[in-house]
Amino acid sequence: MKILSAAPNTGNNICPTNSGIFKPAKAAVKDIQLAVEKLNLADDLLVMAGDNVLDFSLSKFVKFAKEKNTSCVMCHEENELKKQQKTAIITLDGNDLITSYEEKPKEPKGNLAVPPFYCYRACDVKRIQEALENGCGYDAPGSFAAWLSKQAPMHAYVMPGKRYDIGDINSYEYVKSVFSK
């Protein structure tokens, strides 16, 4: 599995949008497509967007995706309506299969929020152009997952720990204090 990340990194198989490997399209879904084309990627992909710090390993998420043999998203419980309205919300059946996927819903059907962490099967990555031609948004990284969930079975892995979104200096300072203990 290859890893695509929008945050700067130095790993061998990580392709940040500011890496100089390609000029970003300034639209997350198009950036994924561009990286796949420029790097000639034909493998399953782990895609992550945003400035996040996790207190858990991603290895179980990747294992889950391989076991389910579908593209997968990660999710966590979010019970605050205002936060639900600013993110993707999904519902699941008893086997973790996504039954609905809404981007920034005014009236959410569920309470499982989807951060920008996705495992895409290689066969699904090949469908990005089809998605873009059929109404998938170009910008938000979750647009492709939302579109794909209506085209093919997708599963969701419940986040086993905490995710810290570093959106400003205050959240950065908070995360520093959490991890320095």
Regions found by a protein language model. Give the residues of each.
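Active-site-adjacent segment of FAD-dependent monooxygenases/related oxidoreductases
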Residues: 1
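Short secondary-structure junctions
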Residues: 8-10, 98
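Catalytic-core segments of class I nucleotidyltransferases/pyrophosphorylases
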Residues: 62-66, 97-165, 169-181
